């Protein structure tokens, strides 16, 4: 459910997204509140070679990041973005990474021309008037500009300006490149903020555990993308352990902001407010909690559409692919692969669900 986006406004945006074809409404009985979105075939994943840290010097960008001179980057990006909003609606998204008003939280504002971005950010972050009220007259917020432009991969850039608290993304409409609160802010910009303020932004899950004696422990764990963070974060204790009183709960499945407390211990929050999970391989056995979370108010991206019941399907969901379906590129698919043509990609290289 969207947090901070009024129900009436949310319904209007969802209806507009379906009217324009940007999204498809799914079966309200089987998947209430769920939508399907397809990106262009050339825009299906984060693009690390087009992602830049535009710090004052290359040394400040870090050894594993791409660097671009800030002045050069601003000129290039504004030349690409100029006039790209003509004839389009501009949406303004004030959002909080972390609970609104928490001393651990940070605020950002994203401008975008994509309803898909608005509806996803309403799931993944806390948005709305409370954020603006909390910000007040402070200048401590992250500026974000997203321009879909023409989805031209040759002019696609995702640039972070840590010294300016600024993010600019152009020529993409894929989640990881355009939901600027995620990797762009919560990891890249936040890493610089943490360096200045003595805390850490980490690509880590947070998991709570309680034993039968009532002792509670929390763990953080770092895996690369699509390597099991969400599955571990949403772990359910085996029946034998459940019967003995062991409990596990998910605090976060992707990003941790970690601080040292006054008692010398480490404290972490999940700055996000939803889940942006990898769909393939998610099923009743591998991650029943994640699957249950997708059963309502979820935005699916680049998965197959089952035309018989207007639901979605992806690789690994079950062993019964739909025989009357549309793949992630909008092409008819009969649930089979072709040895002559190779496997028909019914889901894209990085299909997602946002719940």
Task: List each language-model region with its residue ranges.
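Active-site-adjacent "gating/activation" loops or surface patches in catalytic cores
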Residues: 180-219
